[in-house]
Design a protein with these regions (language model features):
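N-terminal transmembrane-helix/juxtamembrane module of multi-pass inner/ER membrane proteins
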Residues: 1-63, 112-113, 121, 220-221
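Membrane-embedded alpha-helical segments of multi-pass membrane proteins
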Residues: 18, 54-61, 137-144, 188-192
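Interfacial helix-loop-helix junctions of multi-pass membrane proteins
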Residues: 109, 129-134, 171-198
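Hydrophobic, membrane-inserted alpha-helices
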Residues: 61-66, 142-148, 167-175
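Short hydrophobic alpha-helices at membrane interfaces in multi-pass membrane enzymes
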Residues: 157-170
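C-terminal membrane module of polytopic membrane proteins
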Residues: 183, 189-221
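Membrane-interface loops
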Residues: 27-42, 70-160, 208-221
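Aromatic-anchored segments of alpha-helical transmembrane domains
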Residues: 21-23, 88-97, 167-177
Length: 221
């Protein structure tokens, strides 16, 4: 047991997840005035319920990426956590300081068609409010996982995995706007946040930061 705890002591990072969920769902329950996010471009993006598939695949994608690096490479896992958790915290702060939402969702009852995908989407619309949307965490986390995969030395020659991750990331980003879960504005700022977080997590000149972070918390390793 002691050897196991020493090997996987970086599991302490997982403690962030209950904190994040507590804060996120707390913000979801707020009764406040929301800034409506919209763009003229949103009107030109077609609604397509089929995109509910990559939208839900996001959960498996993030979990699988997280688990892979947790068990295979402590350094890559630390960099992924630095990227995701810092960015997600920034999103929470934005949602708290600048409450936002959108009114893009179609009325599924008058859509004129019903299928397994519209029923899945109806469930999503029921459980997930149209608030706290900008920046898009779906976009941000997908890009973060894709970057982690592309930056992994162990996956450099795994073309199928790399191309699959890229295509899935693009599909997830498209799903957020094609399902009218997000405005194109939310996706844009999710991408901007990804670019910002790339600097401390992966830029070569700053690459030592996660390693220094790990050493600073060496008591947990």
């Amino acid at each position: 047991m002691k050897a196991f705890l020493k090997k996987y002591s970086h599991a302490i990072a997982i403690l962030y997840l209950p904190f994040y969920l507590f804060c996120f769902f707390g913000l979801e329950q707020r009764d406040t005035n929301y800034h409506i996010i919209e763009s003229e471009l949103d009107q030109y993006i077609p609604f397509c319920e089929w995109f509910v598939i990559p939208y839900f695949l996001w959960f498996a994608y993030v979990a699988a990426t997280f688990a892979y690096f947790f068990f295979t490479n402590k350094r890559d896992f630390t960099r992924l956590c630095l990227f995701l958790f810092t960015g997600m915290t920034i999103c929470l702060l934005v949602y708290y300081i600048w409450p936002n939402g959108q009114n893009l969702r179609p009325d599924l009852a008058t859509l004129g068609r019903e299928n397994i995908f519209t029923r899945m989407l109806a469930g999503l619309y029921t459980t997930d409010t149209s608030t706290n949307v900008c920046p898009s965490i779906h976009t941000f986390n997908s890009v973060g996982c894709c970057i982690a995969i592309f930056k992994s030395d162990a996956l450099q020659n795994k073309k199928v995995i790399r191309i699959g991750a890229l295509l899935l990331t693009i599909s997830i980003c498209l799903s957020t706007v094609c399902l009218k879960q997000h405005s194109i504005v939310d996706v844009f700022w999710g991408l901007v946040l990804s670019a910002v977080m790339y600097l401390p997590a992966y830029l070569p000149k700053l690459e030592q930061i996660p390693e220094q972070f790990r050493k600073a918390n060496s008591t947990f390793y």
